[in-house]
A protein has these predicted regions:
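Subset of outer-membrane beta-barrel
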Residues: 1-184
């Protein structure tokens, strides 16, 4: 989620009653009772690529997560959702010259991606509250222990293409495409 993305992705030790922390499934049991959480996150990227002779700008806007968190009773919680696991998206051309083949261009392209579906559950094993007295103040302390687990399923397709285009028609252009389907 954007909440954890804003902390540099350091979400494992964080507990928040109003956010689903899919990086640490033990936190699902801390969701507030009677308040299911639904979250949709988007991610935007602006990338500028530069070489000595060329530059290219590219933009990306896509789903970062689609998550539902459900408190279960006083001590339990569950969550499920979908998010990108990896994305592929590039298109490059590298012009070249060879004394035998003349001018030609190496082309590289890739697109697609793999998504991750998860489901998880958590349960509080220990939940204690106590008052600690100091000289003039009383403070409420909580100590708890929870366990949790997530199960994941990866799916998606991506392709990588490479080829050479020759300006001289005596040479044949070549193209190779590799398509990969993930369902594990």
């Amino acid at each position: 989620s954007a909440y954890y993305f804003g902390s540099g992705g350091l979400n494992i030790p964080m507990v928040n009653y109003n956010q689903v922390n899919f990086g640490n499934p033990a936190t699902y049991s801390y969701l507030l009772r009677h308040k299911p959480i639904f979250s949709v996150g988007y991610k935007a990227k602006m990338i500028q690529l530069n070489t000595a002779t060329d530059n290219q700008n590219t933009n990306y806007l896509g789903l970062s997560d689609f998550v539902m968190g459900l408190p279960i009773g006083k001590k339990g919680g569950a969550a499920f959702g979908i998010m990108p696991f990896s994305t592929v998206g590039y298109n490059m051309a590298d012009p070249s010259y060879d004394s035998h083949a003349g001018n030609h261009t190496y082309n590289y392209a890739g697109n697609g991606g793999v998504n991750k579906v998860f489901i998880g559950a958590s349960r509080k094993l220990i939940n204690r509250s106590f008052l600690a007295k100091t000289d003039s103040t009383k403070m409420k302390h909580e100590s708890s222990l929870s366990i949790g687990t997530n199960a994941y399923y990866l799916f998606g397709t991506y392709s990588n293409t490479r080829g050479v285009d020759f300006e001289d028609f005596t040479y044949l252009d070549t193209r190779s495409e590799i398509n990969t389907q993930v369902s594990d």
